Swiss-Prot record:
Pfam families: Ribosomal_S18
Species annotation: Polaromonas naphthalenivorans (strain CJ2)
Official protein name in the record: Small ribosomal subunit protein bS18
BP term (GO), one: translation
Record keywords, A-Z: Ribonucleoprotein, Ribosomal protein, RNA-binding, rRNA-binding
Self-association and partners: Part of the 30S ribosomal subunit. Forms a tight heterodimer with protein bS6.
Entry-linked InterPro entries: Ribosomal_bS18, Ribosomal_bS18_CS, Ribosomal_bS18_sf
Recorded name of the encoding gene: rpsR
Any one Gene Ontology molecular-function term assigned to this protein's record: small ribosomal subunit rRNA binding
Disulfide pairings: none
Family according to the record: Belongs to the bacterial ribosomal protein bS18 family.
Record PANTHER family: 30S RIBOSOMAL PROTEIN S18, SMALL RIBOSOMAL SUBUNIT PROTEIN BS18M
GO CC, any one term: cytosolic small ribosomal subunit
Biological role stated in the UniProt entry: Binds as a heterodimer with protein bS6 to the central domain of the 16S rRNA, where it helps stabilize the platform of the 30S subunit.
Length: 94
């Protein structure tokens, strides 16, 4: 009886290492602008950090610092509670 086939390391598709090396360096736009606090009433800024589904985009994708990411989270949650931002954009029509 033949045993379970093992995955051969040589036949694995190789990753494109060049794209990993030349990623664009992300920077915190709040640090660059000199912002100290993020306001929940600034809807235009907050919309840049919310996806189409209504989820808050993580800091590793946006490049914001941890301090500002926490402020974005609280500001988005406050704006949602006050109905300035929707919880989700996908409303089903009956």
């Amino acid at each position: 009886m033949a045993g379970p086939k093992r995955f051969n390391k040589d036949k694995r598709p190789k990753r494109n290492t060049q794209s990993l090396l030349f990623k664009r360096k992300r920077f915190c736009r709040f640090t660059a602008a000199g912002v100290e606090e993020i306001d929940y009433k600034d809807i235009d800024t907050l919309r840049d950090f919310v996806s189409e589904n209504g989820k808050i985009i993580p800091a590793r994708l946006t490049g914001t610092r941890a301090i500002f990411q926490r402020q974005i989270n609280t500001a988005v949650k406050r704006a949602r509670f006050l109905a300035m931002l929707p919880y989700s954009d996908q409303h089903r029509s009956l």
